[in-house]
Amino acid sequence: MLPRLATVLLSALGASASVLPTTTTRDLASRAAPVASLCTQYAYLKTNGYEILNNLWGIDTATGGGSQCTYYNGAVGPAVAFSSDWTWRGNDNTVKSYVYANRVFERRLVGDIKSLPTSVQWSYNTTNVRANVAYDIFTHTDVNHPNSSGDFELMIWLQRYGGIWPITESSTGSPVERVTIAGYTWELFTGWNGAMRVYSFLPPSGTSYNSFSADVKLFFDYLGQKYAFPASEQYMLIYNFGTEAFTGGPAHFDVSRFQAEVQV
């Protein structure tokens, strides 16, 4: 992400979705010595069909200091494992980093994509942190638009810490609705980041989805049905998963398995 109640049950967006398998035990890749260490501001690694980025784009707002290193821990079959250690101080309400793994794919119109199956297993050892764990996807009418912004942003938060909030135009901070998609319950927030419309799906307060498997295309389908998202005009630019770090730490974010696919 850039610097920034009606209950609806969609049975049509449920169990029939294409998803990827998950395992019930942590994979060994994230426990071993890292394959690569990424510790500079935009340290980057492309491997196994994924890009790993130590994306410290908000480091200048860390007035109290801090640092972050991200580690590629290896391939787990068709998936990847990565982790990140960080500590940040100063400006509690600004994002210091969004480290992530991004699936490499050929850009296509969202409407031409049949499914976006994904699965992830993650954990967080936290010390007074303000952070989230989230998927982040940008779309734009221009297939060659940079992947750092878009006309639309879809965020799927799996957890949040320290009372942080998504972008919202609600004066009370309330979600616009509660909805069930892909078998999970979400609270939907929406607002603007400059000229970009942002849709953020969050678990209900007190809920954490540490093991998540779903078809992300179902979220776009829902936005098209309910909020007129123009899938036939918008190219998907990026498809990633990671953590936005605000302040706190020392913290250790561990992704033992992340897999994402683009099926057309």
Curated annotation (Swiss-Prot):
Q: State the reactions this protein catalyses.
A: Endohydrolysis of (1->4)-beta-D-glucosidic linkages in cellulose, lichenin and cereal beta-D-glucans
What does UniProt note on temperature dependence for this protein? Optimum temperature is 30-40 degrees Celsius.
Listed under GO biological process in this entry are: cellulose catabolic process
Query: Which Gene Ontology terms of cellular component type are present?
Result: extracellular region
Keyword vocabulary terms for this entry:
Carbohydrate metabolism, Cellulose degradation, Glycoprotein, Glycosidase, Hydrolase, Polysaccharide degradation, Secreted, Signal
Q: Does the keyword Signal apply?
A: yes
Query: How pH affects activity?
Result: Optimum pH is 6.0-7.5.
Q: Which GO terms describe its molecular function?
A: cellulase activity
Q: Which residues are glycosylated?
A: 125, 147
Per UniProt, subcellular location reads as: Secreted
Its induction note reads: Expression invreases increased 4-5 days after inoculation, but is not detected during spore formation.
Other observations noted: The biological conversion of cellulose to glucose generally requires three types of hydrolytic enzymes: (1) Endoglucanases which cut internal beta-1,4-glucosidic bonds; (2) Exocellobiohydrolases that cut the disaccharide cellobiose from the non-reducing end of the cellulose polymer chain; (3) Beta-1,4-glucosidases which hydrolyze the cellobiose and other short cello-oligosaccharides to glucose.
State its role: Endoglucanase that functions in part to hydrolyze 1,3-1,4-beta-glucan during infection and spore formation. Shows preferential hydrolysis of barley beta-glucan and lichenan, but also hydrolyzes carboxymethylcellulose (CMC) to a slight extent.
Q: What is this protein called?
A: Endoglucanase cel12B
